[in-house]
Amino acid sequence: MTITRKSHPLMKMVNHAFIDLPAPSNISSWWNFGSLLGLCLMIQIASGLFLAMHYTSDTLTAFSSVAHICRDVNYGWLIRYIHANGASLFFVCLYLHIGRGIYYGSYMYKETWNIGIILLFLTMATGFMGYVLPWGQMSFWGATVITNLLSAIPYVGTNLVEWIWGGFSVDKATLTRFFAFHFILPFIIAAMAMVHLLFLHETGSNNPLGIPSDSDKIPFHPYYTTKDLLGVFILLALFLTFVLFFPDLLGDPDNYSPANPLNTPPHIKPEWYFLFAYAILRSIPNKLGGVIALVLSILVLALFPLLHTANQRSMMFRPISQILFWTLVSDLMILTWIGGQPVEPPFIIIGQIASILYFSIILVLMPMAGFIENKLMKW
């Protein structure tokens, strides 16, 4: 008689994905972030659902409905701050997950990598629309500025912006549709994450050495379920500490003022996790050029499999590539800092240099480093 988990149609799928899945014996804690992202998504969907029960997507009542959640709903303040800071946690895990993929050459699984890029775009869209919903000053002006960028598209730009707005400015129609999209997108993300996992399990996981691990596999359960669980507890401990002690640290004070179309905030900026892309956008004086650079800053990830010149998959034994990788990480931190600064010297030139360096490292220096390392290996 076969074990139920191996024969039952539903349990069989779970079994193949999380229990009897053959996994490399040497994957490090950097491989924990996939499961942590799944946890983040579940936290966001659950907290978001409870917020949606009390939120109203109307320009007159949106701001006060968020205040009502925080003041009058049982543990509403906690749900609200879990959801707001959960977005930051999501992006921290997301960027670490992508960084791991770049460092260890996981992008060579092209289907998994490309679906990951689509997931990144979907998550960024969800995060942006969620930021608009509280209808504070930064919500309103952030929505106005970012959606208005589409007007840079030749010929159809203006019509496209008015179509997205549902009028001639960001108003009730915009807020209502943003709420609708913000509600549905996480479920699309969840479905895409399953496809992401499906393609990953076609090839099996990569490992820190970047070499085939078919000869040395271990079952996912109990080894990696336990390991992932440790990551979950550490993550939740850090997250709850942040939510309960520093809930407003990453928010913008301007968002505690209701949206006012007649009063522009001195510095319009998105949430911290978009600042690197915002800095790249601002570093180009031309509007259309900035929009193209903004999209390319994320889309450039799709070129990683094509630009891989090294004979070794992982960067573990490639010191030149390692230096470039950590330079890229530092460069992204500089871009994040610049994105939050006003457009004035010396921030303008720093942003422009950092933007050029970002694309140079990925498109030119990393492929060159791989080529040089191949030559050095032959000595």
UniProtKB/Swiss-Prot annotation:
<keyword id="KW-0479">Metal-binding</keyword>
<dbReference type="InterPro" id="IPR005798">
    <property type="entry name" value="Cyt_b/b6_C"/>
</dbReference>
<comment type="function">
    <text>Component of the ubiquinol-cytochrome c reductase complex (complex III or cytochrome b-c1 complex) that is part of the mitochondrial respiratory chain. The b-c1 complex mediates electron transfer from ubiquinol to cytochrome c. Contributes to the generation of a proton gradient across the mitochondrial membrane that is then used for ATP synthesis.</text>
</comment>
<dbReference type="InterPro" id="IPR048259">
    <property type="entry name" value="Cytochrome_b_N_euk/bac"/>
</dbReference>
<feature type="transmembrane region" description="Helical">
    <location>
        <begin position="77"/>
        <end position="98"/>
    </location>
</feature>
<dbReference type="GO" id="GO:0008121">
    <property type="term" value="F:ubiquinol-cytochrome-c reductase activity"/>
</dbReference>
<dbReference type="GO" id="GO:0046872">
    <property type="term" value="F:metal ion binding"/>
</dbReference>
<keyword id="KW-0496">Mitochondrion</keyword>
<feature type="transmembrane region" description="Helical">
    <location>
        <begin position="288"/>
        <end position="308"/>
    </location>
</feature>
<feature type="binding site" description="axial binding residue">
    <location>
        <position position="83"/>
    </location>
    <ligand>
        <name>heme b b562</name>
    </ligand>
</feature>
<dbReference type="InterPro" id="IPR005797">
    <property type="entry name" value="Cyt_b/b6_N"/>
</dbReference>
<feature type="transmembrane region" description="Helical">
    <location>
        <begin position="113"/>
        <end position="133"/>
    </location>
</feature>
<keyword id="KW-0812">Transmembrane</keyword>
<keyword id="KW-0249">Electron transport</keyword>
<comment type="subunit">
    <text>The cytochrome bc1 complex contains 11 subunits: 3 respiratory subunits (MT-CYB, CYC1 and UQCRFS1), 2 core proteins (UQCRC1 and UQCRC2) and 6 low-molecular weight proteins (UQCRH/QCR6, UQCRB/QCR7, UQCRQ/QCR8, UQCR10/QCR9, UQCR11/QCR10 and a cleavage product of UQCRFS1). This cytochrome bc1 complex then forms a dimer.</text>
</comment>
<dbReference type="GO" id="GO:0045275">
    <property type="term" value="C:respiratory chain complex III"/>
</dbReference>
<comment type="similarity">
    <text>Belongs to the cytochrome b family.</text>
</comment>
<protein>
    <recommendedName>
        <fullName>Cytochrome b</fullName>
    </recommendedName>
</protein>
<keyword id="KW-1133">Transmembrane helix</keyword>
<feature type="binding site" description="axial binding residue">
    <location>
        <position position="182"/>
    </location>
    <ligand>
        <name>heme b b562</name>
    </ligand>
</feature>
<keyword id="KW-0830">Ubiquinone</keyword>
<feature type="transmembrane region" description="Helical">
    <location>
        <begin position="178"/>
        <end position="198"/>
    </location>
</feature>
<feature type="transmembrane region" description="Helical">
    <location>
        <begin position="320"/>
        <end position="340"/>
    </location>
</feature>
<feature type="transmembrane region" description="Helical">
    <location>
        <begin position="226"/>
        <end position="246"/>
    </location>
</feature>
<dbReference type="InterPro" id="IPR030689">
    <property type="entry name" value="Cytochrome_b"/>
</dbReference>
<feature type="binding site" description="axial binding residue">
    <location>
        <position position="97"/>
    </location>
    <ligand>
        <name>heme b b566</name>
    </ligand>
</feature>
<dbReference type="InterPro" id="IPR048260">
    <property type="entry name" value="Cytochrome_b_C_euk/bac"/>
</dbReference>
<keyword id="KW-0679">Respiratory chain</keyword>
<feature type="binding site" description="axial binding residue">
    <location>
        <position position="196"/>
    </location>
    <ligand>
        <name>heme b b566</name>
    </ligand>
</feature>
<dbReference type="InterPro" id="IPR016174">
    <property type="entry name" value="Di-haem_cyt_TM"/>
</dbReference>
<keyword id="KW-0813">Transport</keyword>
<dbReference type="Pfam" id="PF00032">
    <property type="entry name" value="Cytochrom_B_C"/>
</dbReference>
<keyword id="KW-0408">Iron</keyword>
<dbReference type="GO" id="GO:0006122">
    <property type="term" value="P:mitochondrial electron transport, ubiquinol to cytochrome c"/>
</dbReference>
<dbReference type="InterPro" id="IPR036150">
    <property type="entry name" value="Cyt_b/b6_C_sf"/>
</dbReference>
<feature type="transmembrane region" description="Helical">
    <location>
        <begin position="33"/>
        <end position="53"/>
    </location>
</feature>
<dbReference type="GO" id="GO:0005743">
    <property type="term" value="C:mitochondrial inner membrane"/>
</dbReference>
<keyword id="KW-0472">Membrane</keyword>
<keyword id="KW-0999">Mitochondrion inner membrane</keyword>
<feature type="transmembrane region" description="Helical">
    <location>
        <begin position="347"/>
        <end position="367"/>
    </location>
</feature>
<dbReference type="Pfam" id="PF00033">
    <property type="entry name" value="Cytochrome_B"/>
</dbReference>
<keyword id="KW-0349">Heme</keyword>
